Amino acid sequence: MVVATIKCVVVGDGAVGKTCLLISYTTNKFPSEYVPTVFDNYAVTVMIGDEPYTLGLFDTAGQEDYDRLRPLSYPQTDVFLVCFSVTSPASFENVARSGSRGTSPLPGVLLIVAPVTERGSSVREKLSKQKMSPVRKEDGERMAKDLGAVKYVECSALTQFKLKDVFDEAIVAALEPPAPKKKSHKCLVL
């Protein structure tokens, strides 16, 4: 029996939690230390109905040094998880900027994921010293809509809050991609 594969590529700035997201999901354990990724992949078998699927998870480096290497993982991707940290407004702006250039550099279905640590007072206090504040959920949802993403999900790799939801949504998005939006052709006669 041939098992169908769903390819899921995770992208976003360095140190926003991409690797933690994948390790926590695949092992049910939060990694104890930060190790910058160059490229890594994981595979898990998931059952959808009575059918087994291999969910291929491709972790990419977020550092600018790897901007030219990262696209090598994009071909045949079924779904992209685009990540930013709610405690890093710069990572949020980078996602918004990359999609506002007219066309997204990522083909296919996008699912915007915001690994949530906390928006608590200590985080707000730290960011306010830099004249910043945590990214609000409403802003994430708006950006996801503006970029044409199928969903915006906030989760925590540390506590596993909504972590499974992220990958369930990715699987659904890959198996049932949204219909492409029809371009309206308008004719204006003056």
Swiss-Prot record:
GO terms for molecular function: GTP binding; GTPase activity. The gene is CDC42. Residues 188-190 form a propeptide. This is Cell division control protein 42 homolog. It comes from the Eukaryota. GO terms for cellular component: plasma membrane. The modification Cysteine methyl ester is found at C187. InterPro entries: P-loop_NTPase, Small_GTP-bd, Small_GTPase, Small_GTPase_Rho. GTP binds at residues 12-19, 59-63, 117-120. It comes from Colletotrichum gloeosporioides. It holds the Pfam family Ras. PROSITE patterns: RHO.
